[in-house]
Design a protein with these regions (language model features):
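Flexible "cap/lid" loop of the alpha/beta hydrolase fold
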Residues: 101, 105, 112-146
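Conserved alpha/beta-hydrolase catalytic His-Asp/Glu region
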Residues: 125-131, 146-204
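Catalytic active-site module of serine/aspartate enzymes centered on a nucleophile-bearing elbow/loop
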Residues: 236-266
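Short beta-strand/loop motif that positions the catalytic acidic residue
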Residues: 206, 212-214
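Active-site loop/oxyanion-hole signature of alpha/beta-hydrolase fold enzymes
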Residues: 39-40, 44, 50-95, 258
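Conserved HGGG/HGGXW glycine-rich cap/lid loop of the alpha/beta-hydrolase fold
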Residues: 9-65
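Acidic catalytic loop of the alpha/beta-hydrolase fold
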Residues: 217-221
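Alpha/beta-hydrolase fold catalytic core
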Residues: 1-23, 44-47, 85-86, 112, ...
Length: 266
């Protein structure tokens, strides 16, 4: 376990193994625990694995401010730089995919490869230029209201509804427990960043190899949006996992790990 100080905010990094570096960045509300199986699989295959808890998440600090994509990406880049990894494949899930995408665009010397998991990278809501997902206004207001009225219930609904099939209640309880480490002020700020950030202009700046892994029935980020992004990136490979929702690392771990290992060992 390590902590990296970024302008007075401690960012938690679980740093295990030796070899080429793979950094894992979780999505909204989740943290290093999400990747437990993948940490074991990757370290057994000879990789150094860094699970980075974003500010407001996991064991990282939870300041009142600083949850815009630029700040979160800067946290990630600073952590990788301070740990002197030389370069890493960065794997970003959902909201973490947007953060990883911005980091790849701004620090290609540190982000040498990019994996987007259940994430379209550039947007999480519909716009004229990106006609996928829901319009941001009503969705954002609904999420903010739910978080304000019943934080615990809101986290349960958000997590349960993201699976392709009814999940094991024990899995949901575990993910909600992780999610509740994130205080409401961080959640509200991250929802705003998630649904209002547009990274389409970064597409031209992402020159690294990119792997996209998405569940074919992901109810959060559509496979159509992932296909659109693949066509616009310079060097992208898309893996669609059948009958899988928003959590490929949990719902289809064998297929997920096979795709990831093929990419990082190529």
């Amino acid at each position: 376990m390590a902590f990296v100080d970024v302008d007075g905010v401690r960012i938690h990094v679980q740093d295990l193994g030796d070899g080429p570096a793979v950094a894992l960045v979780s999505g909204f509300g989740l943290d290093h625990e999400l990747w437990d199986r993948q940490v074991r699989v990757l370290t057994e295959r000879g990789f150094r694995v860094l699970c980075v808890d974003q500010r407001g998440h996991g064991f990282s600090d939870t300041p009142l401010h600083g949850y815009d994509i630029d700040r979160l990406a800067a946290d990630l880049v600073t952590a990788l730089d301070r740990l002197e990894i030389g370069g890493a494949t960065v794997v970003g899930h959902s909201f973490g995919g947007q953060v990883a995408f911005r980091a790849a665009a701004t620090a290609p010397e540190l982000v040498t490869g990019l994996v987007l998991v259940g994430s379209n990278g550039v947007r999480a809501s519909r716009s004229e230029s990106f006609p996928f997902g829901e319009p941001p206004g009503p969705l954002l207001q609904s999420l903010l209201a739910d978080e304000h009225i019943n934080r615990v219930g809101a986290r349960y609904r958000t997590i349960e509804s993201a699976f392709a099939h009814e999940p094991d209640p024990r899995t949901v309880d575990w993910l909600v427990r992780c999610s509740l480490r994130m205080p409401s002020w961080a959640a509200v700020a991250c929802y705003r960043s998630l649904l209002t950030t547009d990274l389409l202009a970064d597409i031209e700046r992402v020159v690294q190899p990119v792997l996209q892994i998405i569940g074919a029935t992901d109810p959060v980020h559509s496979a159509k949006g992932a296909r659109w992004l693949r066509r616009h990136l310079r060097a992208a490979t898309l893996v669609e996992i059948p009958d899988c929702g928003h959590y490929p690392m949990l719902e289809a771990p064998d297929a997920f790990e096979s795709a990831l290992l093929k990419f990082i060992t190529a």
